[in-house]
Amino acid sequence: MDEAGFVQTQPNRSAWTETGEVHLITAARGKRLNVMAALISTGELFTAKFWETTTAALFGGFLGLLLESVGRPLTVILDNASIHKAKEIQPLLALLKEKGLTLYFLPPYSPELNRVEKLWHKMKYEWMAFKARNSAGLEADVDKFWTVSALIIE
């Protein structure tokens, strides 16, 4: 399980300038589409997307919906992001634990162990065209990958 953010304007990955000149990159930020995804052992991808900032409360809600959707005891493998361990959601996490949820935290700085990280990398750097988008275009581009993405993650 992991979170990622997608912005309307792609970041500059490289630039070209004459030797001795400074290349200035202006900081232009558009709206950010945040996505949470969990890869289920069946190969299904459970996702949620939202334009709001990713918070511990949204994370807790996502876990509740995930557990309800799967409908059986569930172990979620995740990183050590602060929203995953926030004090404000500890009562909710305790309740979800009683309902069959177990959280397994990966070692720090080990994104290669999180299979959903592979999805984010492919979406951001391989599949999505390097272009500016409006909000609707960004959401449509992110949506079109959900149907094939679970098959790609290995």
Tell where the protein language model's regions lie, with residue ranges.
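Short functional hotspots at interaction and active-site rims
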Residues: 1-154
